[in-house]
């Protein structure tokens, strides 16, 4: 017996000694790397949040009419639960990092789709992503490029220009004197990503058992589809070159060039381009950059991507969109960064989406219903129209291009996001998957416009309408062999674009009493182009 005890003690001592040596020698070891720690933290946070929601209305039978009525109002107790839960979720994302931060950022971008308590709390994740050490950065570069940093670069800044959920960017100078930006993937994120997504899927399914009306599987599906693409930096480089070629006619757009000879799946080398963030009004004022011009350029660029090309940069948060004065011409320029996340729209989706926006802009409510339902909205088409435009249903009915959004309307929309959360989550589960990233992109762009004070101008809607007209005309011409029919389509396109120009001219002089009468006459003589 004593011999067995001695043997057990010896083996235990050896195991502890080996563990001690491993822990001491492995400089990159972090408790967060252990699956049990990450899983335990996620399960515990989900359980606490679920318990908080379940007990907030413990005196009211769950699922009863009274429960639904209380929940549908902005009841102070529920607002407090939203806030507590959002903070817990934010802490979980910061602790587990990587994929969790990426998903948290996605949720934080959905300003008009989720309760404000969640979006305002989770927005900090865009600026609080944890940083990899220089030892880890050197390790990734050594493994992927087969050389040390000093062999590749004349100089390399240890302090990153920016840190995101999946990677961080450093400024460096090549031996030939060219200044470059070096994007390096966090070393552990790729290995953890598939396990993290599986964990999220299990937790979302568990929460659905407790709260059947809340359907968030769309979020897991999106992460499962997009994360592998975002983790492949060669794919990001290809996207950058594609969008640069696609939008080459916009002289205000700058996409940094890729250095393919020093790029891998985890390291991306690109031309270094300096500038201020697109929501930084002070930077624009100091550099004499016209805020309204930048807002118009941004709207033109994204309308072209969505309606004409169907290839959309889906992460336009301010850190990924810079502005600057072109060093040669002195003209204002938009610098588009981070090309890891793009959405390729099918032709059917793109054309239906064009028709829907034309209907919304020109207040054709019959077609709003028709094309919303074609895009999967069903009987919830009024809510879907409000989600797309971030306007109230009254404003949609009156015409979203007739008046800009007011502070009162904006507050009403944000409050309704909490009130209609089950219906919103139902819609997000039933619309085409392509729509999810488009909605996220729309909300990020609105956030930029709100920061610049240029949101929802009539001019921006007219620019969208121009792109829709061009896209629909191009589709019709592509599907006919008749020269006469193609000529007819081209004439109709030119006439509809002329209407848009005339409408825009009238809006510029709308302060005159005569303008309203002229506008009414024009709208009566020339129906909305669809």
UniProtKB/Swiss-Prot annotation:
SUPFAM superfamilies: Protein kinase-like (PK-like) (SSF56112). CDD domains: ADCK1-like. The keyword Iron-sulfur does not apply. InterPro entries: ABC1_dom (IPR004147), ADCK1_dom (IPR045307), Kinase-like_dom_sf (IPR011009), Mito_struct-func_regulator (IPR051130). Its EC number is 2.7.-.-. GO terms for molecular function: ATP binding; protein serine/threonine kinase activity. The keyword Kinase applies. Appears to be essential for maintaining mitochondrial cristae formation and mitochondrial function by acting via YME1L1 in a kinase-independent manner to regulate essential mitochondrial structural proteins OPA1 and IMMT. The action of this enzyme is not yet clear. It is not known if it has protein kinase activity and what type of substrate it would phosphorylate (Ser, Thr or Tyr). This is AarF domain-containing protein kinase 1. It comes from Homo sapiens (Human). The lineage of its organism: Eukaryota, Metazoa, Chordata, Craniata, Vertebrata.
């Amino acid at each position: 017996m004593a011999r067995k005890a001695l043997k057990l003690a010896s083996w235990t001592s050896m195991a502890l000694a080996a563990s001690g040596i491993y822990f001491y020698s492995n400089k990159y070891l972090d408790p967060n790397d252990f699956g049990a720690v990450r899983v335990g933290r996620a399960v515990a946070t989900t359980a606490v949040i679920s318990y908080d929601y379940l007990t907030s209305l413990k005196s009211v039978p769950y699922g009863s009419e009274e429960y639904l009525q209380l929940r549908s109002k902005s009841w102070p107790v529920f607002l407090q639960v939203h806030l507590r839960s959002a903070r817990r979720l934010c802490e979980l994302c910061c602790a587990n990092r990587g994929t969790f931060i990426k998903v948290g950022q996605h949720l934080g971008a959905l300003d008009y789709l989720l309760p404000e308590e969640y979006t305002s709390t989770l927005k900090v994740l865009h600026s609080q992503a944890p940083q990899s050490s220089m030892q880890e950065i050197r390790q990734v570069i050594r493994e992927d490029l087969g050389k040390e940093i000093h062999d590749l670069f004349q100089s390399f800044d240890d302090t990153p220009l920016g840190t995101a959920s999946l990677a961080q960017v450093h400024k460096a100078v090549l031996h030939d004197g060219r200044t470059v930006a070096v994007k390096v993937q966090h070393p552990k994120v790729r290995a953890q990503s598939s396990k993290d997504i599986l964990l999220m899927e299990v937790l979302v399914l568990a929460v659905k058992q407790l709260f059947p009306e809340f359907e968030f599987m769309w979020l897991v599906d999106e992460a499962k589809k997009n994360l592998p693409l975002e983790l492949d930096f060669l794919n990001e480089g290809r996207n950058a070159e594609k969008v640069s070629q696609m939008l080459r006619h916009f002289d205000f757009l700058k996409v940094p060039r890729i250095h393919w000879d020093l790029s891998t799946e985890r390291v991306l080398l690109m031309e270094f381009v300096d500038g201020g963030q697109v929501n930084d009004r002070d930077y624009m004022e100091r550099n004499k950059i016209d805020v309204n011009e930048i807002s118009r350029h941004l709207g033109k660029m994204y309308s072209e991507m969505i309606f004409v090309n169907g290839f959309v940069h889906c992460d336009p948060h301010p850190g990924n969109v810079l502005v600057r004065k072109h060093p040669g011409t002195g003209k204002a320029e938009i610098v588009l960064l981070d090309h890891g996340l793009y959405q390729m729209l099918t032709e059917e989706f793109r054309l239906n989406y064009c028709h829907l926006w034309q209907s919304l802009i020109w207040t054709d409510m019959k077609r709003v219903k028709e094309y919303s339902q074609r895009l999967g909205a069903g009987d919830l088409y009024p809510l879907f129209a409000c989600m797309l435009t971030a306007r109230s249903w009254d404003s949609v009915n009156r015409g979203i291009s007739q008046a800009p959004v007011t502070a009162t309307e904006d507050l009403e929309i944000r409050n309704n996001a909490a009130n209609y959360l089950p219906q919103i989550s139902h819609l997000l589960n039933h619309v085409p998957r392509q729509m999810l990233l488009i909605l996220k992109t729309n909300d990020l762009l609105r956030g930029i416009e709100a920061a610049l004070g240029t949101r929802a101008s009539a001019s921006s809607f007219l620019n969208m309408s121009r792109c829709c007209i061009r896209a629909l005309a191009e589709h019709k011409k592509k599907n006919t062999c008749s020269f006469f029919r193609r000529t007819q389509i081209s004439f109709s396109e030119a006439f509809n674009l002329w209407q848009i120009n005339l409408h825009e001219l009238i809006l510029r002089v709308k302060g005159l009493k005569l303008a309203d009468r002229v506008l009414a006459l024009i709208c009566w003589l020339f129906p909305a182009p669809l």
